[in-house]
């Protein structure tokens, strides 16, 4: 790992005046840890592997230096000629993230007077409009792998002049099954290029990818930088009582907003209907919704018009809500990595957040796997009025133990599970 002295200001990172002016307008007061460590290396042309919590400011981490290098190319006349070429390619796993990243880049570039062209391409919308947007090429292309391959096969864009490749949320792209698409795209890129890889987790697939693609990269690992800002809690419930417990928590806590995760599209609709019968209005967000409807729901949630959103994992990435109070796992995610992606929607950028998982006895084994893979241990708790019925297998109700004991710790006494009065924020630090 690389040890870097953290600059105090964006000016010390070597950013140019138009970018500094825009950051001041956006009230970015100082670089986040990932920005402070990565931006100088990116400006120097180094390959980069970065692991950081969601909400750590990683979009600006790669967007700002890419914009600065493009501006320098324009000023010196080194910008690529006209044609269906792209200079900076950013690959992302979902259409929502593609749109969000492109919007952020355009926002950072407002003082460049339209000199830098940014285009986002993704599935679920007309390919013809995207082909039209790519006429004459583009400086920055933010794309999902599948749609990009479609556009390449239509000769709408070429990748042989790409200078920088950004793999944003690489673990998510691989977990969604984009391995073949990524391999096909990599084969079309020039050998000489800068590669920036960002990933919240580093499973074996991602490690292999970094070994194959990157050249002597700078490595930055900051996943644990703001762990203390996110409180994780686990509540045991009886089978069939999750909806009642969820409604109780929503009504009692009166959260400003809540993001609830389920594992299937039809579960979204079903849970929304059951909550509606209990007087709680919830919007749903999943892959069967058209792009315009999904955009409407996301915009409504971001502006606060929608208080409760029920979503599948398609929303676990690319959803950036300021000060989201709570994320609730109504169903446990299928993979330990997806657990981290889900809960990363709350407690972002130093804000205090809360992640709640509701588990019945059928979930216990899977949650232990999630804990083991993510090297966490969470106490099982119960909510007053919804105590768990006694079951024959006491080991199921036993809280999972740490995977390894510290030396000399000896045997640990098993603690009784708490029964609480749903004081969900117990243990959280005060927040404005």
Regions found by a protein language model. Name each.
Residues 2-394:
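Conserved helicase RecA-like core
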Residues 377-432:
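Non-catalytic, charged low-complexity extensions flanking SF2 helicase motor domains
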């Amino acid at each position: 790992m690389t040890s870097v002295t953290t600059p105090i200001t964006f000016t010390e990172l070597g950013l140019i005046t138009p970018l500094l002016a825009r950051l001041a307008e956006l009230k970015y007061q100082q670089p986040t840890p990932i920005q402070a460590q990565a931006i100088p290396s990116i400006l120097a042309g180094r390959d980069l592997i970065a692991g950081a919590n969601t909400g750590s400011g990683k979009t600006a981490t790669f967007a700002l230096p890419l914009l600065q290098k493009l501006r320098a190319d324009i000023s010196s006349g080194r910008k690529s000629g006209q044609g269906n070429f792209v200079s900076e390619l950013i690959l992302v796993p979902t259409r929502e993230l593609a749109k969000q990243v492109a919007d952020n880049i355009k926002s950072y570039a407002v003082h460049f007077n339209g000199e830098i062209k940014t285009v986002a391409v993704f599935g679920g919308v007309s390919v013809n409009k995207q082909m039209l947007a790519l006429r004459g090429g583009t400086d920055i292309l933010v794309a999902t792998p599948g749609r990009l391959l479609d556009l390449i096969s239509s000769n709408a864009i070429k990748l042989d002049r790409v200078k920088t490749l950004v793999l944003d949320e690489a673990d998510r792209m691989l977990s969604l099954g984009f391995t073949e698409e990524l391999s096909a795209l990599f084969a079309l890129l020039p050998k000489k290029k800068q590669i920036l890889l960002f990933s919240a987790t580093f499973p074996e697939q991602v490690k292999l990818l970094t070994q194959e693609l990157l050249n002597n990269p700078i490595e930055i690992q900051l996943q644990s930088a703001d762990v203390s800002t996110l409180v994780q809690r686990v509540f045991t419930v009886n089978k069939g009582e999750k909806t009642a417990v969820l409604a109780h928590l929503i009504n009692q806590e009166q959260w400003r907003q809540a993001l609830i995760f389920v594992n299937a599209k039809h579960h979204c609709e079903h849970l929304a209907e059951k909550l509606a019968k209990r007087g709680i209005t919830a919007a749903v967000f999943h892959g069967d919704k058209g792009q315009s409807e999904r955009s409407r729901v996301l915009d409504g949630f971001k502006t606060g018009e929608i208080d409760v959103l029920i979503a599948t994992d398609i929303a676990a990435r690319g959803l950036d809500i300021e000060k989201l109070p709570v994320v609730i796992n109504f169903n446990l995610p299928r993979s330990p990595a997806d657990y981290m992606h889900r809960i990363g929607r709350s407690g972002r950028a130093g804000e205090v957040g809360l992640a709640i998982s509701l588990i019945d006895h059928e979930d216990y084994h899977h949650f232990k796997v999630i804990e083991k893979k993510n090297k966490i241990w969470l106490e099982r708790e119960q909510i007053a009025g919804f105590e768990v019925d006694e079951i024959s297998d006491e080991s199921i109700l036993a809280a999972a133990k740490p995977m390894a004991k510290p030396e000399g710790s000896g045997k640990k006494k098993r603690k009784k599970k708490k029964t609480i009065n749903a004081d969900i924020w117990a243990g959280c630090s005060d927040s404005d």
